[in-house]
Amino acid sequence: MPVIISNKLSKEQEEKLVVVLKEHKTALGWTIADIKGISPSTCMHRILLEDNAKPSRQPQRRLNPPMMEVVKKEVLKLLQSGMIYPISDSQWVSPTQVVPKKGGITVVENHQGEFVPTRVQSGWRVCIDYRKLNSVTRIDHFPLPFIDQMLERLSGRSYYCFLDGYSGYFQIAIAPEDQEKTTFTCPFGTFAYRRMPFGLCNAPGTFQRCMVSIFSEYIEHFIEVFMDDFTVYGDNFDACLNHLSLVLKRCVETNLVLNSENCHFMVEQGIVLRSYCVVQGY
């Protein structure tokens, strides 16, 4: 089970951490096939339209050969994992586009000698242009947390675990009656989503509401949640490890899967929402 942990841990601390991770190994995912899906009874995405909404069927957009290969690979992956399915009679059809994909946050030194967080392009991302659908969708006003308050609660802790949801949106089901509204067209056919894709205007609110529901009694006590970025913390190793165990247990119970490659366990500093979170403050 290769995972990223602090290189400052003692042998005993490493062993304790490994025991906890092995005990909750189903909370960690390696491929999209590991996503089981959060129960619709816990959370499900709805697409509610304004009363005067008129369906829109848009044509596919032209893609150059390299981008067609990107789309083909993505469509096959999503079909095989059951995230999408072919559809031919939808009243709503949106076009596909390909945009640069940003990788994880890294730290680079600028011209002033300051270390700043940045993202580098790591490939291409297939997105659906849902602007017409979004323009007639009733807006969900579920609030996101204030970042400055989150950082205040996080600063000065001894240990952190930075956790990342695996393809977070894809873990939430779309209501069956709303799936056809997510239909997209590409050179390989028309497909609709069973799980919540990027690009829907209310997806962030649905996801945040779902995470708050899952971790409600833990938030602001030993975990901070901002979309699919979760930060577990503690004032000493054993406290942080116990908090991590509780969070992973909740993940297993709710089928929430974390991206094992992007999680950092029991570290003393890191980056939260592009801000340093260190022992001395932020």
Question: Which role fits each region the language model picked out?
Answer:
Residues M1-Y282:
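Retroelement reverse transcriptase polymerase core
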